[in-house]
């Protein structure tokens, strides 16, 4: 059953374009007032923290450059925004332009504009539009899949398929992770939705075309499978709500209490290949068992109960083996992890970089 809420009903032939054919629609509800469009995918660079920048630097060098990741999707958090704004600066320093992050399955993030304008991005397969980005996407049909009128179609089905089978990597933030890598944004008192993350953040078994990054994730247990998608979860090891790593996700109890047949887990641990905290990167794809995954996670969760499960000697050996990496292992200077390294520090700066085409949504405008 397809129900459409619309702002207006017009005569036949007056639509500028057709996104949904009329014979697919069962019911039309005309709204009493226009539906408010929200800038769902916009993150203000001014709110990016130094920890996000450090984690972004580690991700670029220790994951994207290490595996040659070219096609990817970012979630809508500040972690992804930081990485997008680091590409024209830190990524440029590493000589990675044209080698990583060239093809995106992504809503039109304003924070990607500096990378687009500096020649990093070849194509963006967008799910849909974003408030304030219409003029910019219309002006860049070389990057975005726009129609003859310059507008983005509702492209969700194609973008989901590209995300499931076409791209090399999904990266997203989470609020809580258990000791084997299951994660969720549903916690006590915080029922954050996780949108398309379960679709993007899983190893789709039907893929057969190969890339370097995909092949490097091949199981090490003699499986015939030749590769899998990189699934990266980013999270601070602790916050004001307590440790990010917990023995059991609060989502399990919440799901049980709500009568759900399946717990609202965002991404299953068996699909997670990398976990990044402010302490370092755990290369979970190298783990052979759940116990090994726990050990790697403990190395990037020092100062929490989970972190007590490994000794300094364990950490030293795992660093040497390349199963975990701290900033120093990646030759990253922690003191550089601040806003000075971002390609733009405000949305107003992004608007300037866009040549005035990006319009900062009212919610973010300085009063």
For the regions a language model picked out, list residue spans one by one:
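Conserved phosphate- and dinucleotide-binding cores of soluble alpha/beta proteins
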Residues: 1-74, 78-102, 110-367
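Active-site histidine-anchored catalytic micro-motif
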Residues: 106
